[in-house]
Amino acid sequence: MKMANSLRGEVLKLYKNLLYLGRDYPKGADYFKKRLKNIFLKNKDVKNPEKIKELIAQGEFVMKELEALYFLRKYRAMKQRYYSDTNKTN
């Protein structure tokens, strides 16, 4: 029972982190929130601890991908701001 509670906490933490990251999703926060909720509800009946750990790892991978997407978008915007002016003057 102790393991199930710790996994439950990890799942909730993952959900909250993904929900937070979804605020800046390109298709909109509402779109991301609906998809996230559907995915978590689809897997709510999984009881096998190994399968739960696998799903958590998958969710953490998605988190890292989202972070990379956001960093790349910010980098591109910043690069465009700074380097677009120098190209126009030359």
From Swiss-Prot:
The keyword Transmembrane does not apply. One of its GO terms (cellular component) is mitochondrion. GO terms for biological process: negative regulation of oxidative phosphorylation; respiratory electron transport chain. It comes from the Eukaryota. Its main location: mitochondrion. GO terms for molecular function: enzyme inhibitor activity. Keywords: Mitochondrion. It is found in: Mitochondrion. The keyword Mitochondrion applies. homotetramer. Interacts with NDUFAB1. Interacts with ETFA. Interacts with ETFB. Belongs to the complex I LYR family. Acts as a regulator of the electron transfer flavoprotein by promoting the removal of flavin from the ETF holoenzyme (composed of ETFA and ETFB). This is Electron transfer flavoprotein regulatory factor 1. The gene is ETFRF1.
